[in-house]
């Protein structure tokens, strides 16, 4: 990895996620003592995509660590849209299920947008339902998508101010880039979102106080593209042929320029998963209050 510069601080998502998990474990135990109930997350996995299987396993292990119940449904690649919608409907109507999550990407013959919209917004712990996205845009309380929520928590934990800062976000996905840009905007940043059609990404990154990237391209962000003292948030996860897992940033060199940087792994990844657990607990508590 090379020696970091003396001044750079690694944004340790793993350590922060561990602390939040301990807190969740305590809360869930207290709820269980009082009500004999536990939050329960339903996870739907379609097909055998290796990365999806890995992510689902990580989510389930995290549920186990905090004492949250889960229900995992693994479905064949060739399941019909109607069958999947029917399963989601069952989970929506099941009072013991607090949150419903469909692991993306889905096979080509299934319309992901329609599936996201089929989940009850009150159980949409991924924060992908149009109603929750709309609430995010209008700053109403909603389930925040887990990765952007995790990024904001990580920056907050390290007292990295966002108000008045220039932020460059590379990647305009509905899951990460767009909601993250909205959270940054809500926190008072001036935000530029770059994507495949952006003429000169350097122009945006070199002027940014905070650079967030999540597109799935190793070494996309080089040290020369960063201004001295930038905060670098690497949301990319790439599995290299030699078995290494790296992000989208040339970490070895970028850490010589940055003031703060997330490692990959152990940076944003653990924060994503713990944010999902937090959303599930919030969903559970809201449903209990409604006498659901």
Curated annotation (Swiss-Prot):
Catalytic reaction list: (6R)-5,10-methylene-5,6,7,8-tetrahydrofolate + NADP(+) = (6R)-5,10-methenyltetrahydrofolate + NADPH; (6R)-5,10-methenyltetrahydrofolate + H2O = (6R)-10-formyltetrahydrofolate + H(+)
Amino acids binding NADP(+): 171-173, 196, 237
Pathway: One-carbon metabolism; tetrahydrofolate interconversion
EC number(s) stated in the UniProt entry for this protein: 1.5.1.5, 3.5.4.9
GO molecular function, one term: methenyltetrahydrofolate cyclohydrolase activity
PROSITE patterns: THF_DHG_CYH_1 (PS00766), THF_DHG_CYH_2 (PS00767)
Keywords noted in UniProt: Amino-acid biosynthesis, Histidine biosynthesis, Hydrolase, Methionine biosynthesis, Multifunctional enzyme, NADP, One-carbon metabolism, Oxidoreductase, Purine biosynthesis
Organism, scientific name: Helicobacter acinonychis (strain Sheeba)
Subunit text: Homodimer.
InterPro entries to which the protein is assigned, alphabetical: Aminoacid_DH-like_N_sf (IPR046346), NAD(P)-bd_dom_sf (IPR036291), THF_DH/CycHdrlase (IPR000672), THF_DH/CycHdrlase_cat_dom (IPR020630), THF_DH/CycHdrlase_CS (IPR020867), THF_DH/CycHdrlase_NAD-bd_dom (IPR020631)
CC terms in the record's Gene Ontology section: cytosol
Reported function: Catalyzes the oxidation of 5,10-methylenetetrahydrofolate to 5,10-methenyltetrahydrofolate and then the hydrolysis of 5,10-methenyltetrahydrofolate to 10-formyltetrahydrofolate.
Cross-referenced Pfam families: THF_DHG_CYH, THF_DHG_CYH_C
Any single GO BP term: tetrahydrofolate interconversion
Name this polypeptide is given: Bifunctional protein FolD
Top-level taxon of the source organism: Bacteria
Amino-acid biosynthesis among keywords: yes
Annotated family: Belongs to the tetrahydrofolate dehydrogenase/cyclohydrolase family.
Keyword Zinc found: no
NCBIfam families per record: PRK14191.1
């Amino acid at each position: 990895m090379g020696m970091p510069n003396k001044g750079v601080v690694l944004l340790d998502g793993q350590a922060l996620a561990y602390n939040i998990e301990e807190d969740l474990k305590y809360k869930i135990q207290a709820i269980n003592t009082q009500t004999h109930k536990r939050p329960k997350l339903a996870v739907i996995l379609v097909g055998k995509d290796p990365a999806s299987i890995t992510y689902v396993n990580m989510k389930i292990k995290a549920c186990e660590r905090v004492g949250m119940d889960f229900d995992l449904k693994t479905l064949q690649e060739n399941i019909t849209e109607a069958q999947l919608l029917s399963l989601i409907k069952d989970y929506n109507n099941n009072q013991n299920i607090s949150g419903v999550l469909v692991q993306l990407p889905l096979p080509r013959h299934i319309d992901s947008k329609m599936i996201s919209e089929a989940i009850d917004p009150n159980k949409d712990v991924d924060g992908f339902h149009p109603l929750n996205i709309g609430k995010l845009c209008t700053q109403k309380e909603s389930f925040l998508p887990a990765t952007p929520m995790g990024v904001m928590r990580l920056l907050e934990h390290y007292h990295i101010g966002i108000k008045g800062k220039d932020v460059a976000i590379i990647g305009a996905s509905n899951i990460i880039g767009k909601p993250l840009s909205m959270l940054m905007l809500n926190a008072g940043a001036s935000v530029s979102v770059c994507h495949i059609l952006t003429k000169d990404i350097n122009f945006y990154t070199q002027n940014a106080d905070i650079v967030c990237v999540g597109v799935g391209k190793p070494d996309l962000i080089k040290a020369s593209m960063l201004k001295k003292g930038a905060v670098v948030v690497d949301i990319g996860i790439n599995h290299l042929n030699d078995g290494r897992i790296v992000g989208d940033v040339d970490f070895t060199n970028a850490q010589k320029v940055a003031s703060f940087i997330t490692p990959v792994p152990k940076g944003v990844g653990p924060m994503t998963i713990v944010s999902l657990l937090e959303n599930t607990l919030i969903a559970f508590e809201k449903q209990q209050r409604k006498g659901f």
